[in-house]
C-alpha cells in the first residue's frame, strides 16, 4: 500500500514487498503493456532512459537491492568460479527483456484483453523474496493460497542463492531484464562502468 508505489525506483524492487517505498520499473512496464487498453508507457520508458543514460550499470552495482543481496551471498567463504566461460549466458537477459517483459504480456492475453506480467509472475526471484515469503509468514490467508507457482518461484530463488555463492551476481548477469536495459544504455551513460582487468 502507499502512494509511493506509483513512482518507479531504478532497481529490481518488488512492489508487493510490505516495506517497498516504490515500484519496480519492470513490473510497472508489464502492467501497462498487459493492460486491456495498452498505450505506450512514456513515463516508465522515459524513466528508464533517463536513469540509464545518467548512471548506466552503476545502478546495478550500487542501487539495486537484489544485486546487493547476491553480492552478500558471494562473500560467503567457499570456492568461487569465474563466469568468463559462461559469457553466452549474458544474452539470455535480452531474450527475457524482449520476450517476457515486452511481447508476452502484450500478445498472450485473456478474454478481456489483459496479459500477465510474465517476468514477475514466473521468473523474478525478487518477488518471492521481498513479497511472497514475508507476506505468507504474517497472513494465514496468503499461506493457505500458496501453490505450485510459489514452489516454482522458491526453486528459482534457491537456485539463484546457491549460484550466487559460487558465481558473482548470476541473476544480474544472465537473466535480469533491467540489467539488459542498463547494459545497453551504459555505452552512452555519464557514469560508464568498465572492467579494467
Label the predicted regions.
Residues 1-197:
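Non-ligating segments of multi-cofactor redox enzymes
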